[in-house]
Amino acid sequence: MAKAHRLVASTSTVHWGYFDSELKPALEVDSGDTVTIETVSGGADVLPGPGYYVPPELLEIHDNVPRKMLGHILTGPIRINTAKINQVLQVDIIDIKLRQDWGYNFIRPLSGGLPGEFHETTKMTIRLDNDAQEGELPWGTRLPLRPFF
């Protein structure tokens, strides 16, 4: 019978900036199980100012999880007990809900999709409205959110 699992983001369940097949699984599940995965995002350099919700575990991760490379904080890995090497796995994303009321955009010279277009480092905090599913840019423009990954 399929089970429901929850994998929280914590200092013992995340790794920062890399993938590695040798990582110990943070969770083991059977095929057909449902997993709710909590995620966090961003280093201390992109935290928002006062008035935003910052999950306490994000600050603990900043203090206690080594940042091996530039990149995202990843929750997991998850081991599928019956999976074999070279098998293709089907993962269905049922729903995505925001945990924070902010996101960020970070631009660095000589990086990203337009490396020659930006000559200064810029960080922008974007207010997120989970109920309206909108992001509000600092100058007031509101954009629809369609989380997909």
Regions found by a protein language model. Give the residues of each.
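Short, solvent-exposed loop/turn positions at domain surfaces
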Residues: 22-24, 74-77
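Residue-level recognition of short, solvent-exposed, well-ordered loop/turn junctions
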Residues: 30, 81-84
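A generic structural signal for residues embedded in beta-strands
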Residues: 37, 88-91
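Extracellular beta-rich ligand/substrate-recognition surface
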Residues: 67-71
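Conserved beta-strand/loop scaffold segments within soluble protein domains that form the structured core
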Residues: 78-81, 109
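Intrinsically disordered, low-complexity linker/loop segments enriched in Gly/Pro
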Residues: 72, 95-149
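N-terminal, Lys/Arg-enriched amphipathic/low-complexity engagement segments
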Residues: 2-66
